[in-house]
């Protein structure tokens, strides 16, 4: 593989001195017993690369990157890809205690993260909608835009920064297939307007913004569902960059996640395979 460019950010560290750095990551090929982790990376702080390679474990956990001497409050933190094969990094933790026990269970980790990032324990109320669409690929875009044009108040939730899914500027899979075929001759009208999102991303975003009853939420990943009996009452989404959570209420939900995530979270029957 060809390593990708470094990913960097600035963080504020309150005290000078020695800090120990952990990353929550794993070897994503370990379920298939691949001996050498394909997604390895290192962390650099203020340009100094820490000792240990990361992305080696067989499950999501905190791996020790190394220690660093901090001299200023503002510091650069950089992920340095070593392989070009999709390394995973969920979070980076700076601690004065090398032997600290860091939460890793789902519930404990969520509470720990919210505490450190000052995120409220309860999600923000995102309001009630006539229709909530989860996923903004071509299917989600079509459902949301058409719903808004029919007069519905629509929330379109996308877990990527850009619309289009596989047809977006991130992936660029060409849109193809039959449209406007009997007996559903109107099926495909919105897709004909959109065409290939990757070639007209700004225009697609403008289409979304033009619909006055359509609210668009990029970078929000739906991870939880609440139900009354068998009926979905709300979905909760987390911002993939800052961790903020918003709960969206509706009586109608469309799963356009591409992987059936919403249906799975709601307890729907499913199968795994290829067609």
Where are these regions (language model features)?
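Extracytoplasmic
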Residues: 1-123
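Beta1/beta-strand and adjacent pyrophosphate-binding region of the FAD-binding site
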Residues: 125-137
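Core beta-strand elements of the Rossmann-like FAD/NAD(P) dinucleotide-binding domain
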Residues: 127-129, 243-252
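N-terminal Rossmann-fold NAD(P) dinucleotide-binding loop
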Residues: 140
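Aromatic pocket-lining residues of Rossmann-like dinucleotide-binding sites
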Residues: 147
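Conserved N-terminal/central alpha/beta ligand/cofactor-binding core
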Residues: 152-153, 158-231, 237, 271
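Glycine-rich loop(s) and the adjacent beta-strand/alpha-helix scaffold that form part
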Residues: 255-275
């Amino acid at each position: 593989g060809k390593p990708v460019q470094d990913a960097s950010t600035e963080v504020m560290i309150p005290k000078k001195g020695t800090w120990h750095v952990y990353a929550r990551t794993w070897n994503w090929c370990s379920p298939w017993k691949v001996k050498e982790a394909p997604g390895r990376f290192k962390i650099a702080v203020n340009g100094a690369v820490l000792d240990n390679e990361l992305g080696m474990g067989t499950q999501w956990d905190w791996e020790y990157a190394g220690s660093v001497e901090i001299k200023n409050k503002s510091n650069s933190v950089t992920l340095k890809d070593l392989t070009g094969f999709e390394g995973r990094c969920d979070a980076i933790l700076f601690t004065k205690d090398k032997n600290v026990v860091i939460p890793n269970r789902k519930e404990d980790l969520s509470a720990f993260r919210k505490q450190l990032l000052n995120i409220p324990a309860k999600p923000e109320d995102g309001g009630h909608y006539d229709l909530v669409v989860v996923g903004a690929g071509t299917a989600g875009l079509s459902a949301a835009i058409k719903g808004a044009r029919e007069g519905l108040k629509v929330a379109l939730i996308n877990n990527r920064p850009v619309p289009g899914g596989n047809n977006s500027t991130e992936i660029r899979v060409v849109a193809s297939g039959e449209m406007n075929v009997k007996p559903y001759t109107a099926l495909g009208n919105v897709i004909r307007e959109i065409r290939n999102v990757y070639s007209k991303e700004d225009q697609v975003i403008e289409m979304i913004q033009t619909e006055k009853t359509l609210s668009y939420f990029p970078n929000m990943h739906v991870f939880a569902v609440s139900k009354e009996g068998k009926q979905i009452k709300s979905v909760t989404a987390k911002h993939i960059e800052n961790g903020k959570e918003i709960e969206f209420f509706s009586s109608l939900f469309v799963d356009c996640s591409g992987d059936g995530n919403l249906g799975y979270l709601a307890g729907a029957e499913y199968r795994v395979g290829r067609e």
